[in-house]
Amino acid sequence: MDMSGESSIKRRRSSIAASAERPAKHLRPENSTLTPGDATPANGTVYAVEDEGDAGRMMPIGPAQADSPEWQATIENVVKSVVSIHFCQTCSFDTDMSMSSQATGFVVDAERGYILTNRHVVCAGPFWGYCIFDNHEECDVRPVYRDPVHDFGILKFDPKAIRYLELTELKLRPEAARVGSEIRVVGNDAGEKLSILSGVISRLDRNAPEYGDGYCDFNTNYIQAAAAASGGSSGSPVVNIDGHAIALQAGGRADGAATDYFLPLDRPLRALQCIQRGEPVTRGTIQTQWILKPFDECRRLGLTPDWEAAVRKAAPQETSMLVAEIILPEGPADGKLEEGDVLLQVNGELLTQFIRLDDILDSSVGKPVRLLVQRGGQNVEVECEVGDLHAITPDRFVTVAGGTFHNLSYQQARLYAIATRGVYICEAAGSFKLENTLSGWIIDSVDKRPTRNLDEFIEVMRAIPDRSRVVVSYRHIRDLHTRGTGIVYIDRHWHPKMRMAVRNDGTGLWDFSDLADPVPAAAPVPRKADFIHLDGVSQAAVSDIVRSFVRVSCTMPLKLDGYPQAKKTGYGLVVDAEKGLVVVSRAIVPYDLCDINITVADSIIVTAQVVFLHPLQNYTVIQYDPSLVQAPVQSAKLSTEYIKQGQETIFVGFNQNFRIVVAKTTVTDITTVSIPANASAPRYRAINLDAVTVDTGLSGQCTNGVLIGEDGVVQALWLNYLGERTPSSHKDVEYHLGFATPALLPVTTKIQQGIIPKLRILNMESYVVQMSQARIMGVSEQWIQKVAQANPARHQLFMVRKVDCPPPQYSSTADALEEGDIILTLDGKLITRVSELDTMYDKEVLDVLIVRNGEELHLKVPTIPTEDLETDRAVVFCGAVLQKPHHAVRQQISKLHSEVYVSARSRGSPAYQYGLSPTNFITAVNGVPTPNLDSFVREVSKIPDNTYFRLRAVTFDNVPWVVTMKKNDHYFPMSEYIKDPSQPLGWLTVSHDRDRHKDGITPDQANLNPDAMDEAFEQVSDVEPDVE
């Protein structure tokens, strides 16, 4: 978009995902659906998935022309000082999301080991990275300084670690930047480690570019040139023919124009000298943004001819003056300066340049300065107290209840012209995922108590018990006119720690400390409520069924099983009010590592637990404590007869506003379907089910509901089914289909009797074949006649489409189904309906009659216990979520390479940085085989912190590869979740790094934010957008 004429500005930071040094064989492609078209439901609805970023459009880069011998000699010396920086911001902070990327820097002090690069490379938040020199020696780097405003920072490395290269440094010569000077940009352009781009300086007085909502430099001029650099060249030195660094590459245009913007080196040189002398880098501010405006604009603002003449005489080369653009409320200049004031003098000195203004303010922290401005042709002199710029730049943050908070920064305040006051959510996750937006919220109050700053927020949060629901008042920084009010559920059980992180410039790390243990949850109390009455609805059955619905909200603290979301809400149907049993879609409650809250009558909120997860048919049975609900909840009556095509029924559903809608309709079709498999990452999907569709447009708008008869008996559940992710838009398809209630009864009846069903299934997926196909494949006329008699409504048989990869103990059997087998009978019963496959649920071995290659065969096929297919353990290591391959993986793969499967990974983690992707299998650590999680945990526990190790991995498509990774226990300690019914949460949390940290580590401290995790590789940039 255009921003005051500065259109399509980009920062130069590269994504590691597109590295040219290794083909992307370790990534799972997103190609197409994997289910035959005739078995795919037709009413899929596409829902947006939060993409992590957008790489933007990059222009083609032309090579530099052949250089003169002088330039060649210069470049040969310069490249020895240039380094490629690979780095992560391990968690979101201020304007930046957690991410992994590449950039450039250059050595400015070879003796002490200082590297100059951009501030958006050094990161405002926790940084972790390393640099690679021209001879491919590698060295860890840590931040020693990042400027609060200007786009530069300084990293430090150990010069003694570089053994094979004679270190050289580039001299900073800011005064050598002149219009018309020929320059070279030497850096890691487009992630290619070393590129040399040529250009000519065209301007020295450009205002700092605006990058949009993220970090932006201001209160400095920029140098403009035509060099056509791109992502990864951030921090590159801009050198002249003498080999001196005269500017720092920072940004450029992304609209095809070969225009780049360089930061002058005056203030970086001053900061470097302060650090070399061991002095603090003082930074002063009056919280005012100034911009350069040419004399013609200044005249329109009221610059008098006398002052213009004085300025032109004192500085004949000047064509512009500094004009106040933004004065922050409650700042030193508030009420004294006004927007449009033309700056004339500071402390009696005529002043027209940013550099001198910075110099005066930086040397006057805590002291007053006198400013003379012209306002509408009148001289106005004001005195302002110079504040400390570091004091209004956050250097600490707090994580609590899954969210991350710090004081509002000067960067954000300047961008939106607001006071530098308030608590800012830089990672709106966990309890504080407000309005489904990841960041940008300012918290005004929590639990009816004001939170004007981070300290007040901490004191308020200390006192709130676990599982409390409190009122939060908030505003989004982009819309401060609108104050939102919401109720948040405080989670201090999955996220028990309230932690403070404080930046330590001495070590380059952020030091963590615990602030408060969670206050135990209050005992729940019974509450009363009444259900709504539907006015104008003539059917009495509808009024009764309202009392059988409850709203179900499921929150997942960790991404498992390829599930793409961290929170899902929908409706469930009460099947036993006395026992508190509810049936809900498995697209809402996908696994039992979660918090479930149900709302009864839109009034009473109680917790629930998972009782049963169906492995194939997309429903979950959950249970709440009915003694806490004093409301006339009614058990739904489930039909024992299957609903039929053409039958009249009443559709009762809930739309996207959670409002109940009703329509009389007709069943249009009942089709055997399988939900399409997700190509990029396997995840739970329903297979082998009869889907009911109805003749009403409401069915596509409602995710949950029922089909009922006039007598109020529920004939089918209306459920949402999670489908595939579209490769082009990276959005999830969700199907809305009916599921006949007789298929529920065998399970719900047992649960009502206190028996948890332990189903057994055939490890295969089937789909329908018509008689014309069956005859060609060898089914005899006799069997075709039997099919016609057994199922007059649908003449069909089932063919094995895919045989699942079984658990190891069931992998060797002589009698096994194969792809292409047509199933005739199970234990002597002809199979023409999906419901007839249910005979497998309680049989260890089935007598199966099939047609294979035109011949009838009798097989003794063992079934698989479904409890072996559900996830009961997860290990989080270096930001990767590892688990045993879940059922969806076994459904889509033919061979398991190991039982260490990468299910998800966190942004900004070593797993992300080094390319360990979801759907990979880890088979060995440092050459030692790791067939299961126990062996993996044992081997990686031997690896010291900050040490490289080798992982041998195999992709989902059977391609082996090796990844080298560096362990990071400080930001990503190893932790583990183990299913344990004896625990209050049903899961035991374990840390394997407790002995390395005196205060102990829990999984809550391991950056386990599901909203910052990818469960599938997305073909987009893995950093924040370069193009705004």
UniProtKB/Swiss-Prot annotation:
Its main location: nucleus. Keywords: Apoptosis, Hydrolase, Nucleus, Protease, Repeat, Serine protease. InterPro entries: PDZ (IPR001478), PDZ-like_dom (IPR025926), PDZ_6 (IPR041489), PDZ_sf (IPR036034), Peptidase_S1_PA (IPR009003), Peptidase_S1C (IPR001940). This is Pro-apoptotic serine protease nma111. Residues 1-45 are annotated as: Disordered. It comes from Aspergillus clavatus (strain ATCC 1007 / CBS 513.65 / DSM 816 / NCTC 3887 / NRRL 1 / QM 1276 / 107). Its EC number is 3.4.21.-. Coiled coil: none annotated. Disulfide bonds: none annotated. It is found in: Nucleus. Residues 289-374, 876-957 form the PDZ domain. It is an enzyme of class 3 (hydrolase). Nuclear serine protease which mediates apoptosis. Residues 82-266 are annotated as: Serine protease. One of its GO terms (cellular component) is nucleus. Pfam families: PDZ_1, PDZ_6, Trypsin_2.
